Amino acid sequence: MLVSALWLLAQTCHVLTASRLVQPLSEAPGSMTVIDREMIKASGFRTIPELMRLVPGMYVGYADANRPVVSLHNSTDEFAHRMQILIDGRSIYLPPFGGVNWADLPLLIEDVERIEVVRGPSSASHGANSFYGVINIITRDALSQDGGSLSVTGGDASDMSARFGKSGEKLDYRFSVGYRSDQGLNNSVLNDHNATRIFNLRSNYHPNASDSLDVQLGNSNGGYGLGISGRPEDAFRETTAQSDFQQLSWLHLWSSEHESKLTYSHAMRNSTDPHLCIDSNACQGLYSSSSIFFLPGFTRQEVYSQRNEIELQNTHQLGADNRLVWGGGMRRDYADYPLLLVQPRTLAPWQIFAHDEWHITKAAVLNLGTMFEYNGMGHKNNSPRAAFNYHLTPEHTMRIGVSTATRSPVMAEAYMDANNTIFGGAYVPPVTALTPEKILSQEVGYLGEFRAQGITVDARIYIDQVNDMILVDKWVAPSKGGYADSYKNLVSAEFRGVETTLKYRWNEGRSFVTANYAYQRASAALSAFPTQYFNSAADPSDPSVYSSIGDHVRRFYQSEFIDQFGQTVLTNSGSLLFSQSLADAWQFSAGYYFRGTVRVIDVSPDVTPEYRMRRLDLRLAKTIRYGKDRNIEIAGVVQNITQDDYTKYGTVNATAEVLFKQRTYLTASCNF
């Protein structure tokens, strides 16, 4: 019979994402964080991005308070396209911007079984853009829901969901429908509300002991507000977004030592911003017009993107001490974004990969892997990785690892054509010869598993060196008296840090505490010159301040990026999640999350950095059983109970009106 990978993962310290092989955490080739179902429930979080606060060194922010941003290392930009995000191994990274639109992800948090996070480059297993790390969201199996469930949340959030599933001899299925909404921080300052309707289905057909067919479908439909009060160039407006996906996987067991998996997936997203400002002078009325909604400079922005992908993976047991996984895939990325791409763009990348796990001795494990890929833009890259794990004792493991990764330019960077679209005929330098970003990562890790005591200790020290980082190529446009942007490989950066995790379980595993801490430092330098770096022409914007265009450009990069790069990482950050099972079916949990001040890369230096965060959340739940496998749960959650108000990622300076303050909500759920 087929062995369920999900069942294996449910056992203590087994992971899948690091190498595509199910491995004990002590034999994986990289540092990993696992967020299981119990942690998800105890956290009281309503959305998947919030769960990333339980990962050491992870930045979690919200663009203008309603569009989640998640990334390791520095706080990146709104699209966070240096992180690979997977759902059941399927990349949800979409053109033309890259990154993930977390706000309209067609997945309910109730359908998440566990989340595995690789804290470090993983292109050897998951391809370009697995640059800083990988988040793999593993959903609940089709047979996990036998019956129905309902859930309603009220208070400072309004959520509803219904789930139903059935298990049979050859067919299992589950489906979910839900509605998630949030009014944001303060609608009088930011138009930051959001609402999404979600449908998700998973079905598994297993006609015999050798074959399994898994079908997944999902759809989300909704939108969110945009706009900042008092800014005519960023007026209040409503966006719409629709996302859907389909995934079909066939797993065949050739023998007890060989299996193959063939997967096809399709994903689509369509979004509309009805009133985007593309000329701030016109939008602010500095040109002639009587009404903001008839000013030149506004346009309707529509973005349509889709991805089709097929992948074959083979896993072999080559002997008692060796396992190999290998395969390849092709995909087709398509984006229609008239505002910047002028014409629709299509990319057709492909990749082949292999990973070998060799138990040299009982104590020594060597992981070797690589991926060779063509990015569809004329570049071929190889991303090798090597890790050596040594069991000092059955409970103590040391790991040394070296890996490389690449990040291919996204369509919006590589093919942006702003001439005659945004800047009214002003010359904008074309994007030319962008090359993939590169990273070299070196780490030393330790894992202590004190099984008798229920304690796990995980720690790592790392140095990550990034070359050819793509950055805005600032262009002073004399014909407009302002600026335009292109892109260029401009920067080299280095990240150094320490990450630690302590887990302790007691009361037969029903109670636990998880503590995380991360310390990071970062520095950067220009590795190439911006196009106008040496331009001696007079600066049209403010000749009294800048002696030339080149002087303006040099000051911009030094003061607004290089000097402030160290502020874009979470220097000190951490979390503590505690859950205690009490008498009479009560459960109490508390989560504490902290980080220092941080500056987001793509927010103007005129905007105050995000305040430090010291946040305490509490959850108290009561379960009432009324039959076999039937229960009702009432849970109350108070977030930021100490009212240590903090800002989220945004383009407006923090005031008392735009802070994350105390929030309270109540959830009632039942199974039947």
Regions found by a protein language model. Give the residues of each.
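Extracytoplasmic beta-strand/coil segments of soluble accessory domains associated
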Residues: 13, 17, 24, 32, ...
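Short acidic/polar hinge/loop motifs at secondary-structure boundaries
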Residues: 91-119
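Periplasmic-side early beta-strands and strand-to-turn transitions of outer-membrane beta-barrels
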Residues: 123-124, 136, 144-145, 163-242, ...
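Conserved C-terminal beta-signal and adjacent last beta-strands/turns
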Residues: 165, 204-206, 400, 512-513, ...
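Membrane-embedded beta-barrel scaffold of Gram-negative outer-membrane proteins
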Residues: 171, 259-273, 391, 399, ...
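Face-selective signature of the C-terminal outer-membrane beta-barrel domain
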Residues: 206-220, 240-380, 389-393, 458-461, ...
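Structural signature of Gram-negative outer-membrane beta-barrels, strongest in the C-terminal barrel
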Residues: 208, 319-321, 342-467, 579
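Gram-negative outer-membrane beta-barrel transporters
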Residues: 320, 325, 359-363, 461-465, ...
